[in-house]
Amino acid sequence: MSINNSYFSRNNTIIYNDLTNTGRNPVTELYYGEDGIVNPRGFSRFIFDIDLSLLIEKVNNGIVSTGCTSAMTHTLNMTNTSYFDKDFLNTSTSQGRYRATSFDLFLFRIPPNNSTIPPTPQIWDEGVGYDFISANTPIPNDKNYSDRPSNWSAITTIDTWEEPGIYSNTNSGSFNYNSLQVIDTQHFEFGDENIDFDMTNEINSILNGSITTPVGWGIAYLPQVESLSGTTGTYSVGFFTRHTQTFYEPYLQTNYNDLIEDDRNMFVLGKINKLYLYVYEDGDFKNLDFNPFVEL
């Protein structure tokens, strides 16, 4: 069994009805509920893209010999910022938000813009923002806060999402939740669990060409949670992003079975025997352009 790790190429947290960009923040804070900090009621969603170039190269070069089969699996791993200390359970953050418990997060593919013919990929920029709110500082230019794209409304300076926030959680917009391609859903009982979404079918479909021009994925609370009313506070969960300066950078882990076993030591009559051919050129392994014919 071998492992290949693919890392994020960009990520951002977008905030309901807000132009704030947090692309450079080392933590994504997914929250819902009453929020006097940013909005009277709000929630956030996390978007990201993965650099699959090394994995694609390994598949094309035959290093990953399994092909896009069940022998190759892909899991998205993100570390919870509360994972390390159980004392964080049932407490609040420095901003006064309660740590969320008993909730589901789902992983979805960012859809194309279906208002164009043909539909066009919604290619978004990560942005240069850091803070979730503008700091009250006498410094004229707060370089940690930015309202430049991407954000809830815009993907670039001149382009917007087909639907603000990517989709409508009330199914009343130009692109709705019930039209999303949901990849996986995970339940969080205590709120300190790590993310481990299964992306096997999704990534294999990209590798075999079934999915073309992907522009990334998103993570969000279920619409029923985002739309909760009557809450007396804000509830949040945090995960490390690609900008963390720690070991806990998020990644896609690919596991593939490249164990080669044949019957060279048990080659007998009366059964199907398997042999592997190793081809060398100047002492190095070489891939063939076509299947060879061998006479025994």
Region spans (language model):
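Secreted, disulfide-rich extracellular signaling modules
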Residues: 1-296
